[in-house]
């Protein structure tokens, strides 16, 4: 019988942990405050991003933190990148801002590399600056370091459910900069044997069928895409596999969500499985809060975060 890897307990415990640290930060005269930059004016992306941001804001406000939203998508396209770079520079130096989140995906005419090179690594709550990315290769501490939210959230779920990745054959489907790519590096650091599959990979079913752990982060469900769609079903996996579903897309017309993983068929064979709703999403939100606490200590000390209490 499948064990559901739910994110609610991790989310609740992380918020409780964060509230304790908010009180500790008061000794430094610091209140965690997240600045959120929205640059993408695509109607579908904008609607989705606003929903994501509202959930993140609710979490942060619930621990006693603050959130400020900057709607840069209202700037003309030709001025948006410059406006973002200037704002990031100002926020980097603002003592009352302890974390900065540039919501992805960015519009195609904004240079992502320039944006994240300008962002201070001390306030980078998504772990996307070059300096913070280096930590994935040189070694990381799951409790002390600023790490990409979804990959770190997944690893925290594994820890909570006592899923050991050492020596396991792990397939990561998708090589995106937010999930697939950083997660594959982090898993290798934890001594997993990792295979990354992408749009040009041949015979993806073969690799998935032989994997102990499958993490699917594609977001191209066949219900919405005819070009290179992806759906993980039960006939793809071996008996007893661990399956984590990350990818999903909303139908712009019906507003219905479609996901990478077919829950019903996969649940019949998997030993552990994340639900499409209430799984990785909650873990991602929890990690964002944790990262904000870490960056808040960094801002408070301007040196490095103290050793934080493990959950």
Swiss-Prot record:
Keyword NADP: yes
Positions contributing to NADP(+) binding: 174-176
Gene3D superfamilies from the UniProt entry: Leucine Dehydrogenase, chain A, domain 1 (3.40.50.10860), NAD(P)-binding Rossmann-like Domain (3.40.50.720)
Catalytic activity: (6R)-5,10-methylene-5,6,7,8-tetrahydrofolate + NADP(+) = (6R)-5,10-methenyltetrahydrofolate + NADPH; (6R)-5,10-methenyltetrahydrofolate + H2O = (6R)-10-formyltetrahydrofolate + H(+)
One Gene Ontology cellular component: cytosol
Keywords: Amino-acid biosynthesis, Histidine biosynthesis, Hydrolase, Methionine biosynthesis, Multifunctional enzyme, NADP, One-carbon metabolism, Oxidoreductase, Purine biosynthesis
GO process terms (BP): L-histidine biosynthetic process; methionine biosynthetic process; purine nucleotide biosynthetic process; tetrahydrofolate interconversion
Keyword match Amino-acid biosynthesis: yes
EC number: 1.5.1.5, 3.5.4.9
InterPro entries attached to this UniProt entry: Aminoacid_DH-like_N_sf (IPR046346), NAD(P)-bd_dom_sf (IPR036291), THF_DH/CycHdrlase (IPR000672), THF_DH/CycHdrlase_cat_dom (IPR020630), THF_DH/CycHdrlase_NAD-bd_dom (IPR020631)
Gene Ontology molecular function: any one: methenyltetrahydrofolate cyclohydrolase activity
Biological pathway: One-carbon metabolism; tetrahydrofolate interconversion
SUPFAM superfamilies: Aminoacid dehydrogenase-like, N-terminal domain (SSF53223), NAD(P)-binding Rossmann-fold domains (SSF51735)
Subunit field text: Homodimer.
Family: Belongs to the tetrahydrofolate dehydrogenase/cyclohydrolase family.
Function: Catalyzes the oxidation of 5,10-methylenetetrahydrofolate to 5,10-methenyltetrahydrofolate and then the hydrolysis of 5,10-methenyltetrahydrofolate to 10-formyltetrahydrofolate.
Protein name per the record: Bifunctional protein FolD
Protein species of origin: Pyrobaculum islandicum (strain DSM 4184 / JCM 9189 / GEO3)
